[in-house]
Amino acid sequence: MFKRIDHVALHVSDLDRSVDFYEEHFGFKKYFQHMAAGGMQIAYLKLGDTVLELTHRSDGSMKGFHFCIETESFEEAVAELKKGGVEMARAPHDTAAREPREKGWRRVVFRGPDGEQIEIRG
């Protein structure tokens, strides 16, 4: 049912410095950047088919770490996690594409045992 880790999100204190660091030292390439709700800046970097999501909050807080798992059967995955008693943090919803060649997708967010966010993408 689950295929792979789609992306990992890291909160950083200086978005430009972190983008430069991951591009220069690890070969990542930034492909999209935007300002999200609440003044959070987000930059998406790729290395192969792996995405690193760097976020910076204007208030300096470092909350909301998460990772995302891609699934072949979104509705089945959601049903199984709910059946297993996994707490849902955000209901299933559609998201827009982050780049022109990408299609939007369905996503849902669950919580792990320590409150960590586990995003499921289908």
Residue spans for each PLM region:
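Structural preference for long, well-ordered alpha-helical segments within the folded cores
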Residues: D20-F21, E80, D114
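A short beta-turn/loop motif at secondary-structure boundaries
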Residues: M35-A37, S58-S61, R98-E102
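Core segments of cupin and vicinal oxygen chelate
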Residues: F2, A9-V51
